[in-house]
């Protein structure tokens, strides 16, 4: 059978559903692990203590999610109308919010943080073998760095972390990052003058400052 110019072998629904169940289980397990890793990463970022090894493991998890997502989409096409529930599960586990977070994390750590370069990096990561994805030096090379080892300290821009704060509207995170250059520079400044964030379009600078300190696990002024 041909759908949108792509050929599909007709398989029994039971066979397809067996694959679906395995893929959904992979997505669930990997997503749980990824969420825990991202929470830990946020804390490390705010403490300025992220290493290349920390982000390598997370990029690997994102790619496991992407691969399972691609395979599950094929199953949904094969299931036709019976694939609606599976589609809902896919959106819940690996929807657009995950793609956005992946893009922002790449931009946070790439030597060139442009959206166009992030797209190229995602394509390169998708082509890498699981072995290469687990190798910090291979990942560093894709991000645009040479001569780094797994213990090398990585300084994020802060796009991903800022995007998690509700008072940071679309486009505001970019302005903040352009001004400060790194999340740590931002943290250093808001400890002295949080209201300055209002200059970049943050309607409630105190809320943003408080949110960042809560993520860090400290109270404002005691960092």
PLM region descriptions:
Residues 4-25:
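Intrinsically disordered, low-complexity, Ser/Thr/Glu/Asp/Lys/Arg-enriched terminal regions and linkers
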Residues 1:
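Conserved catalytic cores of phosphodiester-cleaving nucleases, focusing on short active-site segments
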Residues 9, 23-222:
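Long, highly charged, low-complexity intrinsically disordered interaction regions
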């Amino acid at each position: 059978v041909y759908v949108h110019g792509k050929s599909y072998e007709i398989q029994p629904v039971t066979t397809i559903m067996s694959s679906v169940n395995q893929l959904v289980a992979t997505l669930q397990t990997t997503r749980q692990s990824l969420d825990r890793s991202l929470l830990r990463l946020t804390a490390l970022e705010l403490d300025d203590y992220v290493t290349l090894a920390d982000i390598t493991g997370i990029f690997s998890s994102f790619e496991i999610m992407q691969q399972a997502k691609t395979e599950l989409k094929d199953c949904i096409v094969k299931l036709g109308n019976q694939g609606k529930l599976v589609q809902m599960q896919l959106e819940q586990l690996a929807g657009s919010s995950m793609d956005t977070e992946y893009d922002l994390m790449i931009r946070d750590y790439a030597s060139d943080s442009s959206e166009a370069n992030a797209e190229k990096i995602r394509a390169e990561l998708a082509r890498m073998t699981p072995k290469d994805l687990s190798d910090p030096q291979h990942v560093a090379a894709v991000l645009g760095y040479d001569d780094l080892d797994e213990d090398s300290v990585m300084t994020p821009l802060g796009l991903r972390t800022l995007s998690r704060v509700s008072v940071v509207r679309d486009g505001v995170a970019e302005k903040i990052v352009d001004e400060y250059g790194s999340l740590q520079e931002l943290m250093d400044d808001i400890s002295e003058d949080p209201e300055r964030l209002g200059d970049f379009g943050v309607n409630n600078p105190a809320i943003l400052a408080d949110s960042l300190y809560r993520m860090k696990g400290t109270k404002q002024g005691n960092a």
